């Protein structure tokens, strides 16, 4: 769910929910840095486990992932530019 979109930069604030076992393949965001704050659950990212209260950061253009929801996960994610994926 998009909570806010910046009119000038295209940056986004997104509330995301993942079902347990859901996987997002490795990817990069060429136009935006990504910050994901885990509100609930357990998320595995490139071999690192993130739990409620932890913050993940992926610099613009950096390949990261796969994302694996080890449990149901709710996160608040910020992209500081347009959300593009490669």
Tell where the protein language model's regions lie, with residue ranges.
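Short glycine/serine/proline-enriched coil/turn segments at secondary-structure junctions
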Residues: 7-10, 47, 67
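Histidine-centered metal-chelating micro-motifs
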Residues: 23-25, 44, 56, 60-65
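Ligand-binding loop in jelly-roll beta-barrel domains
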Residues: 32, 49-50, 60-86
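Short, well-ordered beta-strand segments in beta-rich or mixed alpha/beta enzyme
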Residues: 15-18, 39-41, 75-77
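Glycine- and acidic-residue-biased ligand/ion/polar-headgroup-sensing regions
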Residues: 20, 29-45, 52
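A short glycine-rich, His/Asp/Glu-containing loop-to-beta-strand
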Residues: 1-25
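A generic structural signal for short coil/turn motifs at secondary-structure boundaries
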Residues: 25-27, 86
């Amino acid at each position: 769910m998009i909570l806010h979109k910046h009119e000038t930069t295209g940056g986004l604030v997104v509330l995301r929910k993942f079902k347990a076992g859901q996987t997002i393949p490795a990817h990069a965001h060429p136009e935006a840095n990504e910050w994901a704050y885990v509100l609930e659950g357990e998320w595995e990212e490139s071999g690192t486990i993130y739990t409620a209260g932890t913050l993940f950061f992926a610099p613009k253009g950096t390949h990261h992932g796969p994302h694996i929801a080890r449990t149901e996960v709710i996160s608040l994610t910020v992209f500081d530019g347009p959300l593009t994926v490669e």
